[in-house]
């Protein structure tokens, strides 16, 4: 490995110390280290700061120091560059991070010697059509969410799968999630958890009315079409909980499997189910 990008979330505790230490060790091993401009300013190495475009072109791996939100942002931003991402958890839950902040030094040798594997995660593409014209497209690692605005009024979302009518969901909205996103908002909305090595999509209604409260798991080869049937409420499309777009009555959102994949660096021999146990129960048998 000849070059590494470091993306620290400068709002997190300990981030300056850990970033500085990693920069020093990687540089001592003759690895070219690039940082975001704000990351470079944080540790006083302004000359190492580059734009995201440059980092995508020169880095062979990107190390992210932050929480799941920081990793999600990097996954979308660097998906076109096909670069493996290593997450170091400085947040709370950390489903996407591979190691915790206090484990960095223990696993650094494995990273330097190439003793790791790469796990690919399916991503989603969401396209908004207005008057049958495409007006914007987003990529997501976790989920695409259609949700009502601040007022307590039910919205209706007509949903089709592969062009076939499925259901018109009355409620607070709809979630289309990847397996990776099944442990996020969809899980909180009552959806099941899907193993991360599967390539499927899941549709989960948000606070649905009466008998509409079941998730539907579909093939990743299908296209989900969700159409707004509401003209009296603010409805927003949210991508990975980070990007938003205001929808209008009659807008269609088409969600499908993306051509991009997120590549996650795996340093630990830990199955998805072991990770699940650690995050949900603290690693205890209950």
Swiss-Prot record:
Annotated InterPro entries: ATP-NAD_kinase_N, ATP-NAD_kinase_PpnK-typ_C, NAD/diacylglycerol_kinase_sf, NADK
Binding site residues for NAD(+): 68-69, 73, 142-143, 153, 172, 183-188, 242
GO biological process: NAD metabolic process; NADP biosynthetic process
GO CC terms in record: cytoplasm
Protein name as annotated: NAD kinase
Catalytic machinery residues: 68
EC class of the enzyme, as a word: transferase
Keyword Lipoprotein included in the entry's annotation: no
Alphabetically ordered keywords of this record: ATP-binding, Cytoplasm, Kinase, NAD, NADP, Nucleotide-binding, Transferase
SUPFAM superfamilies: NAD kinase/diacylglycerol kinase-like
Primary location recorded for the protein, binned into one broad class: cytoplasm
UniProt KW Chloroplast keyword: no
EC number(s) on file: 2.7.1.23
Protein task: Involved in the regulation of the intracellular balance of NAD and NADP, and is a key enzyme in the biosynthesis of NADP. Catalyzes specifically the phosphorylation on 2'-hydroxyl of the adenosine moiety of NAD to yield NADP.
A Pfam family matched in the record: NAD_kinase_C
GO MF: ATP binding; metal ion binding; NAD binding; NAD+ kinase activity
